[in-house]
Design a protein with these regions (language model features):
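N-terminal loops that bind phosphate or other acidic moieties
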Residues: 1-133, 137-380
Length: 380
């Protein structure tokens, strides 16, 4: 029996690879000779760096960068040496989890550290980037990142504008004569699952500003300043289009990537499935196992397990999913390629107990074992 396991992390409990190894252990308790291949899985959000880097035999790098408020923070990203690929999450340098709730103010938060991470990876030889941009604390249009990469986002005195969204109103001109030379050799696959534009009622300020600490007055101001920035960008780079879907991602960071770098915005799960070459493994499998922390109606809206199931169905493979918990509306998963799903909780416990990594691992191994015992009965 050949089984391919690609399971997303159970957030707060098991990483993608830890969950996958637990599944493998459960299978081998029943089928000791089974060929089980564990592949990393993520959707471009939290956990992507660890899952892809470790799952593809890369290495994790630590670098000190400028945090959202200008204070130094330690950011971690991954490098795949063979393909000169860097795997990053912008939240490592400019994420909302780095900002205390009472401190949140997008007028002051910057993406400068994101640019520093990119520069560090370029200095280490990377030319291909996989970039997750969820969970941002910023609304600076990616200006901070661009400044760190050598772009001049200048005020009337020829000085770099201030950090944060407040700096957008200061922009007088944009220069690129000091951009790091290697940037033109780099390509970026940006994991982006939002379609919001840069400005307007569905723009980043209006939709995501409140969760970053913006007041109604701030939202109105930031939207005008971003429009000003977009106009100047368009004069410098005609390809810039503030109305393109995804330009409002991460407080306008999507706009900066599309306008100033060789970047494409793509579904996070699409990037991960392609970069890990999961399809090659699924082709040769007898059975595919996937899952995530919680299976519900949202799972069918482009979450990682459904991406795995779609590939499996392309080759007529059966799919089993395991998850920390399952809601009543998870039945929709059966209509989207998951043949059967199982929660791993084995008794009534507190949330803390359920999420304990030792308990989660034990529950996964034991649940998988029992499901595969049933498969063995059927095979006999």
């Amino acid at each position: 029996m050949k089984v391919v396991v690609a399971i997303d992390s159970l957030k707060g409990s098991l990483s993608s690879l830890e969950a996958g190894e637990a599944v493998s252990e459960g299978i081998h308790k029943v089928f000791p000779r089974a060929e089980v291949t564990v592949r990393p899985l993520a959707d471009g959000g939290e956990g992507t760096v660890e899952a892809l880097t470790l799952g593809m035999n890369g290495r994790l790098e630590k670098v000190i960068v400028t945090g959202p408020f200008g204070r130094h923070v330690e950011a971690i990203y991954g490098i795949l040496e063979k393909s000169k690929t860097a795997i990053m999450e912008m939240s490592a340098a400019a994420g909302i989890t780095l900002v205390d709730e009472q401190e949140r103010n997008p007028l002051n938060t910057t993406t400068y550290g994101v640019g520093e991470m990119i520069k560090d990876a370029i200095d280490k030889g990377c030319r291909h980037f996989i970039m997750g941009i969820g969970g941002s604390a910023t609304n600076d249009g990616g200006v901070g990142m661009l400044q760190a990469l050598g772009y001049g986002i200048l005020d009337k005195e020829g000085k770099q504008v201030s950090f944060g969204a407040k700096g957008l109103k200061e922009i007088d001109r944009i220069t690129d004569d000091s951009v790091i030379l290697e940037l033109k050799e780099c390509s970026f696959r940006v994991a982006c699952d939002v379609t919001n534009t840069l400005c307007g009622e569905q723009g980043c300020s209006a939709i995501f500003g409140p969760q970053k600490g913006a007041t109604p007055d701030m939202i109105e101001q930031m939207d005008k300043w971003l429009a000003h920035y977009a106009r100047l960008t368009g004069e410098k780079y005609p390809k810039a289009d503030r109305n393109q879907a995804g330009t409002g991602a991460a407080g306008g960071l999507g706009f900066a990537f599309l306008s100033y770098t060789n970047a494409v915005l793509e579904s996070g799960i699409k990037i991960i499935l392609e970069e890990t070459r999961l399809e090659e493994y699924v082709k040769a499998a007898d059975l595919v196992v996937t899952g995530e922390g919680r299976l519900d109606a949202q799972t069918v809206m482009g979450k990682a397990p459904i991406g795995v199931a779609e590939i499996a169905k392309k080759y007529g493979k059966k799919v089993i999913a395991f998850s920390g918990c399952v809601t009543e509306d998870a039945v929709e998963c059966n209509n989207h390629g998951i043949d059967a799903y199982f929660p791993i909780l084995r008794s009534v416990v507190s949330l803390e107990e359920a999420m304990d990594s030792k308990n989660a691992r034990k529950n996964m191994v034991e649940t998988v074992e029992q499901v595969f015992r049933l498969i063995k009965i059927y095979e006999q």
